[in-house]
Amino acid sequence: MRSNEAARSQRRIAPWNWTAKACVGFASFEDNGDAMKLTAIETIRLEEFPNLLWVYLHTDQGLVGLGETFYGPGAAEAHIHEVIAPYLLGQDPLEIDRHQAHLLGYLGFVGSSAEMRGRSAVDIALWDLWGHATNQPIYRLLGGAVRDSIRVYNTCAGYRYVRSRPTQGTANFGLGTSAGPYEDLDAFLVRADELAHSLLEMGITGMKIWPFDYAAEASQGQYISAADLGKALEPFERIRKAVGKTMDVMAELHSLWNRPTALKICRALEPLNLLWVEDPVFMDHLHSLEEVARSTTAPVAVGETRGGRADFRSLIEMDALSTIILDLSWCGGISEARKVAMIAEAWHVPVAFHDCSGPVVLAASTHLAMNVRNCFIQEMVRAFYYGWYGELVTTLPPIEQGMIRPPAAPGHGLRLLPEVLKRSDCRRRRSELS
């Protein structure tokens, strides 16, 4: 008798099935036996996309979770196999919070480190796996939706933006060849007015551009001349002249400037009534960021390169920023991003989710955006969305008239296309439960 009771107390749910209880009107989970276990962790890379890394989490019950991260994938991949896999293999994948706490690590626990990026990809895969175990989309597992869809803005990159190397700079802008109708980086440099009209025709009412980067590289971010400042302002002025205030415009500064020059640029942008100016200074000295934010009426938004709730808490407590931006593949995954969003909500600060990386992150972000009340806009890159994203995955979050909604399928709803795994440039690494 005692042994039977002990066995029952140790039994866990795997997989979890929804069964309706008509007498109370609630859904419940049904215990189907022993806990699910992770049996293998697999990473996947394509030479054509050297910044992307996917993670498959395999279970003993045949379910698979898919995660993704972006930028410097080799280091994140090594962390996944050398640090995360030895702990996670054999574990119940549905105990996500416990795994997140254990994997926080002695090093790399803040910022968008290799450890954080690897942990982010695994966390996204764990949530996807939970969705498949329960036959539910992620947004329902988060507590349900506070909205049915959310507005998108277009980051005006082209098809090959940041494709060739893991660096942020004008050499990696992907200019020079046209791969389709949405070469939006070239467009904002030479015909920003036409670009704005093109986006509005699709129902997209927000756009982000970064014409200051050339001047930043020329002076290493230490100075901008009046001529260079005027040249960089031209695309913003063309947009306003062409479409007025029907388009929300954001300026991306890529953390390239010193404090006085960043402030000079922000003040020059003030009359243009931007939605935000993003990452004006390098994020290694928060006092400089705070000084810039408090010294301009232009709204300042930051955060996509940060990771971990403690890191974001320092930004939020600054009480000077207009918007906190989160990248789910860099900040700690869905679990951490949700906690950061809650902290921001307590400070009455809105959040926005980053996407200039990969299709899985876009889908996971869209699910989280359905649940997070203080999220008001989701980034997208239409050149990616209507271009190479569709070459890699089975489906994408639907976008209609500038609004995005999550796929209805379990988990985040995406799977890598079978032909991706058959490509000659596909590289797979696998750690298995011994």
Language model segments and positions:
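Structured beta-strand/loop patches that form or line metal/cofactor-binding pockets in enzymes
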Residues: 36-66, 70, 383-391
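Conserved, mostly hydrophobic/aromatic
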Residues: 38, 62, 84, 122, ...
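Metal-dependent enolase-superfamily TIM-barrel catalytic cores that perform enediolate-based chemistry
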Residues: 149, 154-290, 295-296
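Tryptophan (W) side chains
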Residues: 16-18
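Shared catalytic-loop signature of beta/alpha-barrel
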Residues: 58, 82, 98, 267, ...
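Metal- or metallocofactor-binding catalytic centers and their adjacent structured scaffolds
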Residues: 58-136, 140
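Glycine-rich, aromatic-flanked loop segments that form ligand/cofactor-binding clefts
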Residues: 123-167
